[in-house]
Amino acid sequence: MRTLCTLLCALLAGTVSVAAHHSFAAEYDGEKPVTVTGVVARIDWMNPHIYFYVDVKDDKGGVTQWKFEGYPPNMLVRQGWKRDATMKVGDTVKVFGWRARVNPTQAAGRDVTFADGKKLNCGPPAGTGGQ
């Protein structure tokens, strides 16, 4: 009985960390949609999620780098992405997503629209913000 109780406690403790890792609301604000257009500066195609960075110019010519979190690589492939072909450093993109709660230039990506008009999903839906 004691072994069973220990095993159940260990399993439950593991599920808490998994749930915390996948808590959109803990890191992002579904009430604050954002759309930015800029040039892809870097792509980190890795598990558990990809990250891509977009340099966005303001009206005065200053550049701010936005960090976007996307789906895991295997989910992006199912959405039509190809690791070295879909999005490349230097591409101009428009990204829609939801702002991070803490970092004002970080967001959870939802959709990426490319210069040729092609639009691909890059992350889950969240919040009430529409596009």
Each PLM stretch: what is its role?
Residues 100-124:
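OB-fold/S1-family single-stranded nucleic acid-binding modules
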Residues 5-17:
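Bacterial N-terminal signal peptides
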Residues 62-74:
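Short, basic/aromatic beta-hairpin or loop at an interaction surface
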Residues 19-34:
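Short boundary/loop segments of OB/S1/cold-shock single-stranded nucleic-acid-binding domains
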Residues 128-131:
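Glycine- and charge-enriched low-complexity intrinsically disordered segments
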Residues 46-57:
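Short aromatic-glycine-enriched beta-strand elements
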Residues 78-95:
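Short nucleic-acid-contacting surface segments enriched for D/E, G, S/T with interspersed K/R
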Residues 36-40:
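Conserved hydrophobic positions within beta-strands
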